[in-house]
């Protein structure tokens, strides 16, 4: 009888602990909307984990539709050889509170979308043309395992939330992909820019120790990112 009571008590404790964690799990994605639409008022000074809503009477049908990613940008406009056309809440106010956004990325031959992280979203993508090497790096839990595949037109990929990843055009022609996120504002952390182009700069001795190189190498790398991406 005593053993049975201890078993039940242990079970109750486990359930209570799981229930305590439930709010944390729920907050792992964008909050659920409380109305059909909440077109973002980008001029409003009120921002509480999102944007204030425009009055329904001020939001026409156009907030449901966008042609922004119908065409891409100049793939030679930056040293990466790629161009990102964003379609997050800042560019498409209609997605406010809906927990979704999209990007189009165009690549020159040999162009890359450098190693980066989306801290607030999982990413799902499809290659529209060309062929892209998609690389994903796991956490220490996986021994920093590197997963990769050449993804061709019509094929898809998924990037788990928060994992470092990149895309690289391995073809001889331009390539294009469209990606979707389960957040209206997925965020992005470019690893090279974060390390060597932060404002203010990360102290050189910190990077010397972390990267196991001399100060000259660190200063050279910092000089490459003074103007951002």
From Swiss-Prot:
Disulfide bonds join 38-53. Its main location: secreted. It comes from Oryza sativa subsp. japonica. The keyword rRNA-binding does not apply. Glycans are attached at residues 80, 83. InterPro entries: Cupin_1, Germin, Germin_Mn-BS, RmlC-like_jellyroll, RmlC_Cupin_sf. Keywords: Apoplast, Disulfide bond, Glycoprotein, Manganese, Metal-binding, Secreted, Signal. The keyword Signal applies. Residues 1-31 form the signal peptide. SMART domains: Cupin_1. This is Germin-like protein 3-6. May play a role in plant defense. Probably has no oxalate oxidase activity even if the active site is conserved. Residues 67-219 form the Cupin type-1 domain. Belongs to the germin family.
């Amino acid at each position: 009888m005593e053993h049975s009571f201890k078993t039940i008590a242990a079970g109750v404790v486990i359930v209570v602990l799981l229930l305590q964690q439930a709010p944390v799990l729920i907050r792992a994605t964008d909050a659920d909307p409380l109305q059909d639409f909440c077109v973002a008022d980008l001029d409003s000074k009120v921002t509480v984990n999102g944007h204030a809503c425009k009055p329904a009477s001020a939001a026409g049908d156009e907030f449901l539709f966008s042609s922004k990613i119908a065409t891409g940008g100049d793939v030679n406009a930056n040293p990466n050889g790629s161009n990102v056309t964003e379609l997050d809440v800042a560019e498409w106010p209609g997605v406010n509170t809906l927990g979704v956004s999209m990007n189009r990325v165009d690549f020159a031959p040999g162009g890359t979308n450098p190693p980066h992280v989306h801290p607030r979203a999982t990413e799902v993508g499809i290659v529209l043309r060309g062929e892209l090497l998609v690389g994903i790096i796991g956490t220490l839990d996986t021994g920093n395992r590197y997963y990769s595949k050449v993804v061709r037109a019509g094929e898809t990929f998924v990037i788990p939330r928060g994992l470092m990843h990149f895309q690289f055009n391995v073809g001889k022609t331009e390539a294009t992909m469209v990606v979707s996120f389960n957040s209206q504002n997925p965020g992005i952390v470019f690893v090279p820019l974060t390390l060597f182009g932060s404002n203010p700069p990360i102290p050189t001795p910190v990077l010397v120790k972390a990267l196991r190189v001399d100060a000259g190498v660190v200063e050279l790398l910092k000089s490459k990112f003074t103007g951002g991406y």
